């Protein structure tokens, strides 16, 4: 039989017409007896098989060994046959019996009679493979179908290592078409996938429709692949239905779009073509469902009403694409815009970079802008990845631009074996990053591996967590989980966001699978408050926070945001009062304002950094930002078993939450405020000042400039700095506590483990050092420091090494200096005052006649001319805050 090249977009469009024909058909389950007889497949060994009847199924299972898992990240399963065979791979027997798997793990024998599924080693196995015979194609001339022949095939798999860049995205549309058709086809394909993945997958009816899609697709595309006229007709209908697809994808069951007469005719034509393409047994199944709903009488109905009848409701998420660029030092954004006027580039590139004049200033000379919308597509954003890359390349060639590159909100890539790609744990400086700009996971892990730690409960209040993945097995407390969306105890993730967050926190290390989480002692409480589209109301979230606190969580991760709510604020206070540390994402708007609940006083707000150790372009910043952590291109687990790159403060927050959990694991008696303070005071300073002196300008609602407030030791964009886990856990290990240091004090005091070496630094200059004694107390003598001076206290003992930020606060004014007796023969006024105080000697008229600084111990000697007996002098001390003491009156003696 001649095989034909297929188009997934054509199949998807045709099958979408069947959405309206679905009427509670009931999900078909696999026969338990058949799956129990599944044949075992071995790595590198092929097997043969044969089936005689349509809809016949053969089962196989794969149980990868430890060596295979450590060596390979995926298996490449191949089925070869001249017949039409559907192939599905499942992560477990339970999933196989329910026919639940991801689209990328379904395939069918194509043009060359070969089907390949790349499946990740992300579950503990065994994995199950279903091979299904679908019968033969209907003849194109309408004649009698060929008698079903025996379907012979070969099946086998090989282990393979897929690096992140090796993962392939779904094929857009291999069918031959014009450029305009490719654009339309790709755009509509994205909408249809959104409808299928975010809406149909949520109901039994939707799953049955999807199952029907996989059965019918091979036959539909085979009919159309070689028929150009039919394809053109399909695309005309596709364009007709585009507004319907757009509205349903965006609004789900809330769609108010009414099916028009033109829509109805397009649906009818698509439906008829589908019926003409499939074998008899599928044709009857499709017709039965269409007749039940009277599919050809949909005109005038709203899409939302039709979807509601079928229990399908979800909302997709729209994404944008940006370019980020840095203007060279001593240059400005206007200089780039002026250079563009005479710059040689293609018309498309010039159009794409035209929005540079509207670029948003992130900080210093770093800017971002969005490519202009394509007006030909009704204002829809259609810029391709190729166009974005080209725009960045064009900017990079300009003399006033230091660099430019595309900024992507998330990027799907591949899957311990993927540890080299976890730059937040170990940044090697690759892909434009800065070496060692990471959270210092490896030295922290080395230190903690020698210590006895307690398990710590961390609640992920999110979309749920997929606990079936091997890297999260035993890490998720499903017995403590709850679903506030479905109002049950099944907190399984149906969106992916919560699993990604949980992987960052607690994925098992050194087990060969997938990736490494930051906190080996974390146990995740999955609390589902967001639905399959990633949205939820304040009441659900508030209840989730309270629930997590009541279940014993020491840390709550809130990678979500929205408007202020008194209900939510109450829940935050409730948890804080129970000594729960709450980490909340600062927001992804790139604005000078924190989102809520990050702006609440009851949480630790977390911003995001990138590989270059700078605040990420999307990260909200400003007043109240506590700390930053890696949040750009962060790899972690998603429910389909792969490790996926995502960007956002949602990804930065779990690093801070995991680090907080480690401190509680070291000492469960710590207060949440102590943990937060330790994380902030040990963070790495990543702030920098503009070389050309330019500063970010802020404006109020009336357009008047606002002065950026200055807080010593805190950066406007990154808070206290980028998370440093090694310093934080070392501080906890050393039991380090530092007393407040006032500008009038001459010693830094605190406590630490006996023998801990304490050094006080002002930049690279050491001001003093001492060791903690048997009573754990330390005192480091230093000269008095000015108010707001930022010092760093280095503490070291064994493997534990930390640097703790100390900001000098305003001290009490200097006391009246103690002055020695002054005689007529003396040429100096001597005495004691505060360390480094400026001593002023005044005459009877209170005019300063001499001055000098006291030394580090407060001893002073101010040179004066010899005075007559009975002369009255006044002596004062001016401290580092420039506060002058009361006068000490001295009468010169003989």
Curated annotation (Swiss-Prot):
It comes from the Bacteria. Keywords: Cell wall, Cell wall biogenesis/degradation, Hydrolase, Protease, Secreted, Serine protease, Signal, Zymogen. GO terms for molecular function: serine-type endopeptidase activity. Induction: In stationary phase. GO terms for biological process: cell wall organization; proteolysis. It is found in: Secreted, Cell wall. The keyword rRNA-binding does not apply. Inhibited by PMSF. The active site is at 462 (charge relay system), 497 (charge relay system), 650 (charge relay system). One of its GO terms (cellular component) is extracellular region. SUPFAM superfamilies: Subtilisin-like. Residues 422-729 form the Peptidase S8 domain. Disruption phenotype: Cells lacking this gene have no discernible phenotype with respect to sporulation, motility or growth. Significantly increased amounts of BglS, Epr, Vpr, YclQ and YwsB; decreased amounts of AbnA, PorE, Csn, YncM, Yxal and YweA are detected in the extracellular proteome. Residues 1-31 form the signal peptide. CWBP52 is a serine-type protease that could be involved in proteoglycan peptide bridges. This is Cell wall-associated protease.
């Amino acid at each position: 039989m001649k095989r034909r090249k297929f188009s997934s977009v054509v199949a998807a469009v045709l099958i979408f017409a069947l959405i309206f024909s679905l009427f509670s058909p009931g999900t078909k389950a696999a026969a338990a007896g058949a799956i129990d007889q599944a044949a075992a497949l071995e790595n590198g060994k092929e097997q043969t098989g044969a089936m005689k009847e349509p809809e016949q199924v053969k089962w196989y299972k794969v149980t990868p060994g430890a060596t295979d898992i450590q060596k390979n990240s995926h298996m490449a399963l191949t089925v070869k046959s001249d017949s039409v065979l559907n192939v599905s791979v499942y992560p477990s027997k339970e999933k196989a019996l329910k026919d639940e798997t991801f689209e990328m793990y379904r395939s069918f024998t194509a043009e060359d009679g070969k089907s390949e599924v790349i499946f990740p080693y992300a579950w503990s196995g065994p994995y199950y493979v279903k091979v299904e015979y679908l019968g033969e194609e209907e003849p194109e001339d309408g004649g009698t179908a060929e008698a079903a022949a025996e379907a012979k095939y070969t099946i086998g798999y090989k282990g393979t290592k897929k690096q992140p860049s090796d993962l392939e995205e779904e094929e857009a549309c291999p069918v031959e078409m014009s450029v305009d058709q490719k654009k339309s086809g790709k755009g509509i394909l994205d909408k249809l996938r959104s409808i299928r993945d975010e809406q149909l997958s949520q109901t039994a009816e939707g799953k049955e429709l999807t199952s029907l899609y996989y059965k019918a697709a091979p036959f539909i595309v085979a009919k159309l692949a070689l028929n150009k006229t039919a394809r053109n007709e399909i695309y005309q209908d596709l364009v007709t239905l585009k507004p319907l697809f757009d509205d349903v994808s965006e609004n789900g069951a809330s769609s108010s779009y009414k099916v028009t007469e033109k829509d109805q005719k397009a649906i009818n034509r698509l439906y008829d073509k589908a019926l003409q393409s499939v074998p008899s047994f599928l044709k009857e199944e499709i017709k039965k469902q269409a007749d039940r709903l009277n599919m050809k009488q949909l005109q005038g109905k709203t899409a939302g009403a039709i979807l509601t009848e079928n229990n399908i409701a979800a909302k997709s998420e729209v994404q944008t694409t940006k370019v980020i660029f840095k203007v060279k030092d001593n240059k400005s954004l206007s200089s780039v815009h002026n250079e563009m006027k005479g710059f040689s580039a293609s018309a498309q590139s010039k159009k794409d970079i035209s929005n540079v004049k509207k670029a948003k200033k992130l900080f210093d000379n770093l800017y971002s802008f969005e490519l202009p919308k394509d007006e030909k597509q009704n204002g829809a954003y259609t810029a391709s990845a190729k166009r974005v890359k080209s725009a960045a390349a064009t900017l990079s060639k300009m003399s006033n631009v230091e660099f430019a590159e595309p900024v992507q909100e998330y990027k799907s890539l591949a899957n311990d074996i993927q540890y080299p790609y976890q730059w937040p744990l170990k940044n090697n400086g690759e892909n434009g990053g800065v070496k060692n700009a990471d959270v210092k996971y490896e030295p922290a892990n080395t230190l903690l591996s020698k210590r006895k730690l307690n398990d710590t409960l961390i609640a992920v209040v999110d979309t749920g967590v997929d606990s079936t993945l091997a890297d999260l097995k035993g890490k998720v407390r499903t017995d403590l989980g709850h679903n506030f969306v479905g109002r049950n105890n099944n907190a399984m993730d149906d969106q992916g966001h919560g699993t990604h967050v949980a992987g960052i926190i607690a994925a098992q290390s050194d087990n060969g699978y997938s990736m490494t989480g930051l906190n080996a002692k974390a146990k995740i409480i999955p609390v589902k408050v967001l639905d399959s589209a990633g949205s939820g109301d304040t009441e659900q979230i508030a209840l989730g926070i309270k629930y997590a606190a009541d279940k014993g969580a020491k840390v709550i991760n809130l990678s979500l945001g929205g408007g202020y709510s008194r209900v939510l604020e109450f829940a935050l206070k409730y948890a804080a009062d129970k000594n729960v540390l709450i980490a909340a994402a600062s927001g992804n708007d790139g604005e000078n304002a924190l989102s809520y609940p990050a702006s609440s006083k009851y949480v630790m707000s977390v911003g995001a950094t990138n590989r270059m150790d700078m605040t990420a372009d999307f990260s909200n910043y400003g007043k109240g930002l506590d700390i930053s952590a890696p949040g750009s291109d962060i790899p972690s687990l998603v429910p389909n078993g792969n490790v996926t790159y995502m960007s956002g403060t949602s990804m930065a927050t779990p690093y801070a939450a995991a680090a907080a959990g480690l401190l509680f694991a070291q000492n469960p008696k710590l207060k949440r405020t102590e943990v937060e303070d330790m994380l902030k005071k040990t963070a790495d300073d990543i702030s920098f000042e503009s070389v050309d002196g330019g500063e970010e300008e802020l404006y109020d609602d009336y357009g008047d400039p606002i002065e950026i407030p200055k807080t010593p030791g805190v950066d406007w964009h990154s808070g206290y700095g980028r998370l440093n886990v090694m310093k934080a856990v070392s501080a906890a290990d050393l039991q380090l506590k530092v007393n407040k240091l006032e500008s009038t004090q001459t010693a830094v005091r605190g406590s630490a483990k006996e023998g801990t070496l304490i050094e006080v630094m002002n930049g690279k200059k050491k001001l003093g050092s001492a060791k903690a004694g048997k009573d754990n107390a330390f005192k480091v003598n230093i000269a008095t420091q000015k108010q707001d001076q930022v010092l760093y206290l280095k503490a070291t003992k064994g493997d534990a090494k930390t640097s703790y930020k100390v900001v000098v606060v305003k001290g009490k004014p200097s006391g009246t200096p103690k002055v020695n007796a002054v005689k007529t023969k003396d040429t100096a006024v001597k005495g004691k005052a505060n360390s480094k105080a400026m001593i002023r000697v005044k005459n009877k008229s209170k005019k300063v006649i001499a001055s000098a600084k006291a030394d580090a111990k407060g001893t002073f000697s101010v040179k004066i001319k010899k005075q007559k007996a009975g002369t009255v002098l006044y002596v004062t001390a001016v401290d580092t805050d420039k506060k002058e003491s009361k006068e000490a009156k001295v009468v010169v003696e003989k």
